[in-house]
Amino acid sequence: MSQSTTLILLPQTAYQNPGNGAPYTVVGNAQPAAAYYLGNRDLQTVNLSVTNIIGNVIIQATLANPATVDNQWFDVYEFNGSDNPNATQYTNVTGNFVYMRAKVVDFQQGLVNYVKLSY
């Protein structure tokens, strides 16, 4: 299957010092995953690009439609910025998910250039 849909899970996001230098969390908007439009399709590709980041990018998914509370989301992939603070990479995520989103936790420095979802 060729990929024909690309959605932005998290647009360009720069660390904004909250005044005390403390890390914080950024949560992107939920986007329909492959199963939302394509029924039993279960392969999604996540592309991400970061520059000089300290923090973790977590990809989450849900089976709820719509997901109305945080405990309906579960982690399906985690990128550790401490291991590779300047990266552009992709990973395949398999699952019959309805929605997916990206979040950055312990965000202390740098730039998330993008996090994209394709299927």
Language model region names:
Residues 54-75, 114-118:
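Short, surface-exposed beta-strand/strand-loop-strand elements in extracellular ectodomains
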Residues 31-60, 98-104:
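Beta-rich globular "head" domains
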Residues 34-40, 74-119:
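Beta-sandwich interaction modules
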Residues 2-5, 48, 71-74, 112:
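N-terminal functional modules and adjacent low-complexity/disordered segments of proteins
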Residues 1-41:
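Transition segment at domain starts
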